Amino acid sequence: MSSDRRTARDCSAVFFGEFHDVHVGRAARSRRVHSQPHPHGAGLAAARRDVSRHHAALQSAKALRVLVDLFVERYVDAKLDYIAGLDARGFIIAPIVAYELSVGFVPIRKVGKLPYATQRESYALEYGTATVEIHEDACKPGDRVVIVDDLIATGGTMMAGKNLLERLGAVVVEGAAIVDLPDLGGSALLREAGLPLYTVTEFPGH
């Protein structure tokens, strides 16, 4: 697997730059706001970096192509069987990467969304808990899987996805995301649990 951080930084500049180029009038204010810790906790801090809010960047063929290529180049030689996407924003990028790699796509969904027999995993939120699930036949023992999401904040969703896949016998090769918010502790927690991580960019100070 490749780890060209210079290329990753270039992608970050292209992807998020597309958003600010379209919204020139907001750029200065955006930089000021994004430099301050969020006063209302991890949920809103993560929402501010929600990739789907940067719709202009997603609409840019150049930015989307660069972003997808980064993930594809990293995993092209990893001998994967599946890309697993986390509900919901992981579904933006994960199926595209799976298609480009000619591997299958496994959705890990919020509880109640999958039609057949499932395995469930709950995890803690700032105020309460959440549950995700996976089809019981989504993969088989020994299958090599990368989990993809848009953002790592507290790490709860990706940890739950890891636990579900491993319960089915899969080998979770790595967790991958576009954005890491390292000050929220999720990436450190995941690494301590033995999950290697790859992120395109990070935003400290949240």
UniProtKB/Swiss-Prot annotation:
Pathway(s) of this molecule: Purine metabolism; AMP biosynthesis via salvage pathway; AMP from adenine: step 1/1
GO MF annotations in UniProt: adenine phosphoribosyltransferase activity
Main location: cytoplasm
GO biological process, one term: purine ribonucleoside salvage
PROSITE patterns referenced in this protein's UniProt entry, alphabetically: PUR_PYR_PR_TRANSFER
GO cellular component entries: cytoplasm
Catalyzed reactions: AMP + diphosphate = 5-phospho-alpha-D-ribose 1-diphosphate + adenine
Matching Pfam families: Pribosyltran
Keywords: Cytoplasm, Glycosyltransferase, Purine salvage, Transferase
The UniProt record lists the keyword Amino-acid biosynthesis: no
Locations listed in the record: Cytoplasm
EC code: 2.4.2.7
InterPro entries, per database record: Ade_phspho_trans (IPR005764), Adenine_PRTase (IPR050120), PRibTrfase_dom (IPR000836), PRTase-like (IPR029057)
Main function: Catalyzes a salvage reaction resulting in the formation of AMP, that is energically less costly than de novo synthesis.
Subunit and interaction comment: Homodimer.
Family: Belongs to the purine/pyrimidine phosphoribosyltransferase family.
Descriptive protein name: Adenine phosphoribosyltransferase
Species for this entry: Burkholderia mallei (strain SAVP1)
Gene name for this UniProt entry: apt
